[in-house]
């Protein structure tokens, strides 16, 4: 079975941008036919990687952005080894920016230099832009169980890109 995913093509400031949103979790299993769902299992992830490789080759875009509603534990700042491996595979298949979220709190982010010298970005989780999850926060104690108190924090990014032959900086 070949999966198909919907995506947007955006033309902005001389860039051709592919924006592809996916989710790895479903609140209702019967809704997967209406959204870009990638089950967090090896077979489905490999199919998705092949889809992305083919899409990048077909569209010849300057920038490929993937938005991931990640199969990730909420309220934890840890980036798992499996998550790191998965995101590196996605960068290797041609994605330039991974914009992941699910934890509801801020996680780390990093810039990766690929084999051609291009800079790629992974944002593991940017918190909540708007949140109603925080009630009676307690910031005075160092307690892992209180990470939910950090759900009121969120990041917005300004990323400046420059086109060079064969890469984006």
Which role fits each region the language model picked out?
Residues 20, 65, 102, 124, ...:
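Divalent metal-coordination and catalytic microenvironments
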């Amino acid at each position: 079975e070949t999966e198909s995913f919907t995506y947007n093509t955006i033309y902005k400031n001389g860039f051709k941008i592919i924006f592809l949103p996916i989710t790895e979790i479903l609140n209702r299993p019967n809704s997967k036919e209406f959204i870009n769902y990638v089950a967090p299992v090896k077979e489905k992830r490999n199919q998705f990687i092949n889809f992305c490789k083919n899409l990048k080759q077909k569209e010849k875009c300057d920038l490929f952005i993937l938005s991931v509603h990640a199969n990730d534990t909420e309220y934890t700042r840890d980036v798992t080894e499996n998550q790191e491996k998965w995101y590196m595979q996605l960068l290797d298949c041609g994605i330039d920016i991974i914009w992941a979220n699910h934890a509801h709190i801020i996680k780390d982010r990093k810039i990766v230099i690929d084999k051609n010298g291009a800079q790629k970005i992974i944002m593991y989780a940017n918190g909540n832009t708007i949140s109603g999850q925080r009630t009676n926060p307690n910031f005075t104690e160092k307690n892992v169980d209180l990470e939910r108190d950090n759900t009121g924090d969120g990041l917005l990014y300004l990323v400046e890109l420059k086109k060079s032959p064969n890469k984006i900086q």
